[in-house]
Amino acid sequence: MNAHQSSLPAQTKRTAHIAFSKAPSGASYVSRQEVGYPFHLGRTLTLPQDPPGMAAVYLQSCSGGLFAGEQLHLHLHAGPGTQVHVSTGAATVAHSMLEQSARQTVTLVAEADALLEYLPMATILFPQTRLHSQVNVTLHPGARVLLCDAFCLHTPHGSEGLPDFYRADLQVYSPAGKLLAGDRLAITGADLQRRLPGVSGQRQALATFMLVGQGLPIEDLKRTLRETLRDVADSYQGVSALPNDCGVSVRVMSADAVALRNALHLAWACVRQQLTGLAPRVRRK
């Protein structure tokens, strides 16, 4: 009865688990879904200029964004030989977090010869946001994973300030649990406010895009991506190889969310063309 009562809300853990399998016809489909609040999974779509049999699904949030104290965990499992595209129907808003930080963890498992695309729209960071984003990939032989982690800044009318911090960890593992590649980003509002040349400058949107897979023509991919992104307006891009022969990474910094989205679509279309021979259309969202 006399125990100390904290004024802070309890950490809230919410999970969605979605698995994909390949039908005898060759088409990929959702074979398992455990999706609770705030996640909502739309029906499986077949979209023009996608590879034959690819399953495209969109995740949405019913809560209006990410809030202080939340811990969201999304688990996507692409079975052997599946082709899967997962995105979001809209950008996710990370609201001001005065009491506690929030964490969003995404686990991607791509089994043998699977193609898994996890390409959500950028997270919108409000003033005083404190968010940790983590993406963990398990890569099986012959699998290909496209993934993106992106954010942009927004100050609603009548408010002021910058995000407290944004941290992103992207890690790629073998089926045995060996770390193949890792990428870490940590930035604070104070860093952004300084507008340092070579760090952020005047740019307010940033993304990391990766193609993860072994046995890829890395040098050809690097050259093609650099040529594709060379003349993108209002953006600065860098392309590099990941260690342990597990793919390529693209870092994009843009003036705003529109420029960032344009650059990311070009990177995605370039890689999809190289992998499947088909370039995707711009998606309406």
Swiss-Prot record:
It is found in: Cytoplasm. Keywords: Chaperone, Cytoplasm, Nickel insertion. Pfam families: UreD (PF01774). Its main location: cytoplasm. The keyword Transferase does not apply. GO terms for molecular function: nickel cation binding. GO terms for cellular component: cytoplasm. Belongs to the UreD family. Required for maturation of urease via the functional incorporation of the urease nickel metallocenter. UreD, UreF and UreG form a complex that acts as a GTP-hydrolysis-dependent molecular chaperone, activating the urease apoprotein by helping to assemble the nickel containing metallocenter of UreC. The UreE protein probably delivers the nickel. This is Urease accessory protein UreD 1. It comes from Pseudomonas syringae pv. syringae (strain B728a). The gene is ureD1.
